[in-house]
C-alpha cells in the first residue's frame, strides 16, 4: 500500500519504511507526526473523503542542510560578476505506518 502526502507545498509518494526529505518541520529527532494523505493506493485507489479515513504516521529522523548550489550573475561589458551559495534546510522523516 502506498500513499501520497503533502508537505511544504510538495507532494510525495510514500510507503511504510520509506525515509523522505521534506521541507523543514518543527520538532526534534524522534518526535512522531500524523499526516493526512491526499491519495491512498494499492489494489484500489482512494481519493478525497475516502482517503481522509487513513492517517500516515511518521517519525522525524533528522534535520539537515541539502547540497550546496551556487547562483551566478553576470552582465557583459561592465565586469559585473556575483556568486552566491545556498543550502536548503530539510527534515528527514521515516514513514512508520499507513492506517
Swiss-Prot record:
Q: Which domain of life is it from?
A: Bacteria
Which GO terms fall under molecular function for this chain's record?
rRNA binding; structural constituent of ribosome
Q: Looking at the UniProt record for this protein, which Gene Ontology cellular component terms does it annotate, in alphabetical order?
A: cytoplasm; ribonucleoprotein complex; ribosome
User: Which biological process terms from the Gene Ontology are attached to this UniProt entry?
Assistant: translation
| Keyword terms of this UniProt record | Ribonucleoprotein, Ribosomal protein, RNA-binding, rRNA-binding
Q: Is Magnesium given among the entry's keywords?
A: no
Q: List the disulfide bonds.
A: none
Quaternary structure and partners: Part of the 50S ribosomal subunit. Contacts protein L20.
State what this protein does.
This protein binds to 23S rRNA in the presence of protein L20.
**Family membership:** Belongs to the bacterial ribosomal protein bL21 family.
Q: Sorted alphabetically, which HAMAP family does this protein's record hold? A: Ribosomal_bL21
Among PANTHER family, the record links this protein to: 50S RIBOSOMAL PROTEIN L21, LARGE RIBOSOMAL SUBUNIT PROTEIN BL21M
Name assigned to this protein: Large ribosomal subunit protein bL21
Species:
Deinococcus geothermalis (strain DSM 11300 / CIP 105573 / AG-3a)
Amino acid at each position: 500500500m502506498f500513499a501520497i502526502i503533502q508537505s511544504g507545498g510538495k507532494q510525495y509518494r510514500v510507503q511504510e519504511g520509506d525515509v523522505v526529505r521534506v521541507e523543514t518541520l518543527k520538532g526534534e529527532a524522534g518526535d512522531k507526526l500524523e499526516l493526512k494523505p491526499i491519495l491512498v493506493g494499492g489494489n484500489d485507489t482512494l481519493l478525497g473523503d475516502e482517503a481522509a479515513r487513513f492517517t500516515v504516521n511518521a517519525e522525524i529522523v533528522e534535520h539537515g542542510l541539502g547540497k550546496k548550489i551556487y547562483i551566478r550573475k553576470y552582465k557583459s561589458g561592465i565586469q559585473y560578476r556575483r556568486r552566491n551559495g545556498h543550502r536548503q534546510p530539510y527534515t528527514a522523516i521515516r514513514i512508520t505506518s499507513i492506517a
